[in-house]
């Protein structure tokens, strides 16, 4: 049994984690170390305002003048990744830092997996981190479930879970 814990908009969450005054504001994130800085992540308020990933900050501001443009904070990203890994390691001894904002946990004992993963998601929420998780028999299915979860999604039958999904879903993860 595997669980994947996923932090959506990881870079944006890292940049905004200690700025609760920006909750509800339209915020976009750029990587200022790129040759041409474009918006790489944005929050729902910015999306509703018509801002899209791939736009330049100027284009985003043309869509919504009150858009707040932030730059990546790599030190905060490192701290957030360490926090995620810390909580993931409370679940089982076999944990992989799969990518930025993603940890995969392998369970040798399937008892109380759902309750324990829900506990970790709640602990992350208390630390001002929005996370979601997927639980399944394979790491790939748990990864996909985590991306589609509202909070925690347990997949007992991978075939029935995957069958209705459009192929575009796989391209988005």
Language model segments and positions:
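Residues that scaffold, gate, or flank divalent-cation-dependent active/transport sites
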Residues: 1-104, 109-111, 115-121, 125-126, ...
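Short, conserved secondary-structure transition motifs
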Residues: 135-149
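Compact, charge-rich alpha-helical regulatory domains located at protein termini
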Residues: 146-173
